[in-house]
Amino acid sequence: MTPGIRAPFLLTLLLALVTDPNSVALSQDTSSSSTLNTTPVHSGSSAPATSSAVDSATTPGHSGSSAPPTSSAVNSATTPGHSGSSAPPTSSAVNSATTPVHSGSSAPVTSSAVNSATTPVHSGSSAPPTSSAVNSATTPVHSGSSAPVTSSAVNSATTPVHSGSSAPVTSSAVDSATTPVHSGSSAPPTSSAVNSATTPVHSGSSAPVTSSAVNSATTPVHSGSSAPVTSSAVNSATTPVHSGSSAPPTSSVVNSATTPVHSGSSAPPTSSAVNLATTPVHSGSSTPATNSTTDSATTPVPPGSSMQTTEAISGSANTPIHNGSLVPTTSSALVPTTSAAHSGASAMTNSSESDLATTPIDSGTSISTTKAPATTPVHNGSLVPTTSSVLGSATTLIHNDTSTMATTTPVGNGTQSSVPSRHPVTPTPPAVSSNSTIALSTYYSTALSPAFSSHAAPQVSVGVSFFLLSFHIWNHQFNSSLEDPSSNYYQELKRNVSGLFLQVFSRAFLGISTIEFRSGSVVVDSTVIFREGAVNASEVKSQLLQHEQEAEEYNLAISKINVGEMQFPSSAQSWPGVPGWGIALLVLVCILVALAIVYLIALAVCQCRRKNYGQLDIFPIQDSYHPMSEYPTYHTHGRYVPPGSTKRSPYEEVSAGNGSSLSYTNPVVATTSANL
């Protein structure tokens, strides 16, 4: 030990012995400059303190807490250790502040910034904070809590941890907001923005908060809740989580709105727009909300409701959900109006137009609205799928558990008439009305569109009857203009005839198919269409004769009426049917053809199998077994000889003796004897 170091050490030891003779102190002070301050050690504590910074913040340790602070900045503040703490301070800077250690506490503090804030540790807590920024905020830890705090920003806000809580806080921005943790909670917040909002965690809650924006809003977590919050925008709104709720919101916009979650709810909202609206979730509700617009409206979800909201526009409407309702809302237009769902309602709204109307849903309702619908409120459990493709569509109100799908077809009452034309046209279905009938004619055919009144149901198909009607008009003279359908005389006369038929036959009359005029005064030849079964030929003639006065009103003096009904062959009669014997013959032919096909298949299979298998010769020529043959007596079994083989079996080998005698040789025995 050099004399320059030994002298201050001995001086410190003497001062400790003089101050408290009953205590045993060990103090090592290392100084590399002049004008060192006093470093007293009390009550048997060991306090090697290291100070290398000027005016660093105070880091006290109280009540058996473990707080190893390290100071490496200029003008470091006091670092006392109390209640049996152990604080080895080391001083390596000029004008370092006093570092007392009291009552066996351990408080190593590390400070690497100028004018850093105080980091106290109380009541047996473990708080190794590290400060690497200028004017960082206070990070106190109380009541046996564990709070490793890292501060790397200027003027960061306070991050206190109380009552046995664990709060590792990381601050890397200027003027970040406070992040307190209370009552055994775990709150590792991270702040990397300027003036970030407060992120407190209370009552055993877990709240890892990450802030990377300027002036972000508060994100408190209360009563055992879990609230990991990430803020990456300026002035983001508050995201509190209360009563055991889980709320990991992420904010990446400027001045985003509040997203609170209460009473065991789960609310991970994501905000990526400016000035987003509030999205609160109450009473165990689940609310994943994504906001990507500016000035979006409020989307609250109270008691146990589930809501997914996606907004990609500016100024979207409110979508509140109450009492366990499910409302996924998608908005892609400017300034849509409110879409509320109440009391267990399900409301899916897709809007792609501007100025959408209000769509509230109450009491378990389900509604789907697409593209600029007008107001469609549904109350008391009704189901109303409404689709609108225009702006400002009409209102559809449905109450009392009704289910309604409406299709509007504007139809007006009254009659429909067309001006007679002299050009032939194609006939179309006639018009039907409950209040009046329509009868128009052309030279060849008149097309009448059906018009249904509000009191008559539309008919898809109407049976019709055609009548050939001819009569004479003796108060008119025939001229060449009646042969031209475009002439005024032709049009006037045809219009009068049609009006007469309409007045006489009323609703039974459907129209005139063809009409022509010829000479004889004026002879009218027409094909008239009536409703099927309404009239017959005799009734048509009698009614025309009875309404001669009505004919005079149309300037028609009719006579010589002839009516004949046209008979059209039906579809069944147009194609003659097959007689029964023909059908029977056809079935028989089909059966015979099927049997022939089966027989041919079986025959082919038999031929193939016969070619694959060999022939079985029961008495072959070279067989050795023939009861009455000239072969030797002992040859009792035949041997199989493959075709084309001249080698005989060794059991059939015969050796000649004196010329006529035959002997049988057993090759196995012969081989065995030779081997022996």
UniProtKB/Swiss-Prot annotation:
The chain crosses the membrane at residues 583-603. Residues 655-662 are annotated as: Required for interaction with beta- and gamma-catenins. InterPro entries: SEA_dom, SEA_dom_sf. Keywords: Autocatalytic cleavage, Cell membrane, Cytoplasm, Glycoprotein, Lipoprotein, Membrane, Nucleus, Palmitate, Phosphoprotein, Repeat, Signal, Transmembrane, Transmembrane helix. This is Mucin-1. Sequence repeats lie at residues 40-59, 60-79, 80-99, 100-119, 120-139, 140-159, 160-179, 180-199, 200-219, 220-239, 240-259, 260-279, 280-299. The modification Phosphotyrosine is found at residues 625, 634, 640, 651, 664. The alpha subunit has cell adhesive properties. Can act both as an adhesion and an anti-adhesion protein. May provide a protective layer on epithelial cells against bacterial and enzyme attack. The beta subunit contains a C-terminal domain which is involved in cell signaling, through phosphorylations and protein-protein interactions. Modulates signaling in ERK, Src and NF-kappaB pathways. In activated T-cells, influences directly or indirectly the Ras/MAPK pathway. Promotes tumor progression. Regulates P53-mediated transcription and determines cell fate in the genotoxic stress response. Binds, together with KLF4, the PE21 promoter element of P53 and represses P53 activity. GO terms for cellular component: apical plasma membrane; cytoplasm; nucleus. A lipid is attached at residues 606, 608 (S-palmitoyl cysteine). The gene is MUC1. The alpha subunit forms a tight, non-covalent heterodimeric complex with the proteolytically-released beta-subunit. Binds directly the SH2 domain of GRB2, and forms a MUC1/GRB2/SOS1 complex involved in RAS signaling. The cytoplasmic tail (MUC1CT) interacts with several proteins such as SRC, CTNNB1 and ERBs. Interaction with the SH2 domain of CSK decreases interaction with GSK3B. Interacts with CTNNB1/beta-catenin and JUP/gamma-catenin and promotes cell adhesion. Interaction with JUP/gamma-catenin is induced by heregulin. Binds PRKCD, ERBB2, ERBB3 and ERBB4. The modification Phosphothreonine is found at residue 646. It is a single-pass type I membrane protein. It comes from the Eukaryota. Residues 1-25 form the signal peptide. PROSITE patterns: SEA (PS50024). The record marks 520-521 as: Cleavage. Probably both N- and O-glycosylated (in repeat region). Proteolytic cleavage in the SEA domain occurs in the endoplasmic reticulum by an autoproteolytic mechanism and requires the full-length SEA domain as well as requiring a Ser, Thr or Cys residue at the P + 1 site. Ectodomain shedding is mediated by ADAM17 in uterine epithelial cells. The keyword GTP-binding does not apply. SMART domains: SEA. Glycans are attached at residues 43, 45-46, 50-52, 56, 58-59, 291, 323, 350, 380, 400, 413, 435, 479, 496, 536. A motif (Required for interaction with AP1S2) lies at residues 664-667. It is found in: Apical cell membrane. It comes from Mesocricetus auratus. Residues 645-652 are annotated as: Required for interaction with GSK3B.
